[in-house]
């Protein structure tokens, strides 16, 4: 009986050590990441959108959508603008009022990951659930590459938004001008 308890205890400790090690490696990888560029697929309800983005920490993002409206999304770290280039309409948000404020804040992500227990999903991803005020964000990292591979949030209309990112490139030379907010006409 004591042998069984000892074996269970050792297996449990081994599993916890593996999770802790993976978590530490994810944190280290995030600390070394200054920017990332990627393609994405975003699902909001039945609607699927695709495109590409550049994130520069802290809190800057530029995304170009491959859709009929040729939508772009830009944050300069304070504001977030979504522009429909076909009809020239603009949507302006304070970044701090959106879940992207947290996702684009590398320091916040690292601080939260240090406090949280992650879980393995489909033996491929490591997931952390961040809760901040009214925002619940699931972030996913690839177990092999340790890279951020997506997130799940709710939009302002309480629709589930799932963003999967791929073809990820880290620490590329980027044009800082892409984070300038488009001028409203």
Stretches found by the model and what they are:
Residues 28-48:
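A short, Trp-centered hydrophobic/proline-enriched beta-strand micro-motif
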Residues 44-46, 86-88, 157:
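Solvent-exposed strand-loop boundary residues in beta-sheet-rich modules
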Residues 5-14:
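Sec-dependent N-terminal signal peptides
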Residues 17-20:
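Boundary at the C-terminal end of the N-terminal hydrophobic targeting segment
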Residues 111-185:
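Gly/Pro-enriched, hydrophobic low-complexity segments
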Residues 40, 61-65, 80-83, 128, ...:
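Short hydrophobic/aromatic-rich beta-strand segments that constitute the beta-sheet cores
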Residues 53-102, 161:
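An acidic-aromatic
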Residues 86-125:
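Flexible, surface-exposed loop/linker segments and immediately adjacent secondary-structure boundaries
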């Amino acid at each position: 009986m004591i042998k069984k308890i000892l074996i269970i205890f050792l297996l449990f400790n081994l599993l916890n050590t593996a999770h802790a090690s993976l978590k530490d490696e994810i944190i280290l990888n995030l600390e070394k990441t200054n920017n990332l560029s990627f393609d994405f697929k975003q699902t909001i309800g039945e609607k699927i959108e695709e495109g590409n983005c550049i994130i520069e920490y802290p809190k800057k993002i530029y995304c170009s959508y491959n859709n009929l409206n040729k939508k772009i999304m830009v944050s300069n770290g304070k504001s977030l603008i979504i522009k429909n280039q076909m009809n020239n309409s603009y949507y302006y948000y304070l970044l701090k009022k959106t879940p992207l404020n947290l996702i684009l804040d590398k320091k916040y992500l690292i601080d939260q990951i240090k406090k949280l227990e992650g879980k393995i999903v489909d033996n491929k991803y490591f997931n952390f659930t961040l809760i901040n005020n009214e925002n619940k964000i699931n972030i996913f990292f690839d177990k092999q590459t340790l890279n951020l591979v997506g997130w799940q949030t709710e939009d302002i209309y309480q629709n589930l938004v799932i963003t999967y990112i791929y073809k990820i490139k880290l620490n590329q030379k980027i044009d800082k001008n892409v984070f300038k907010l488009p001028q409203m006409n």
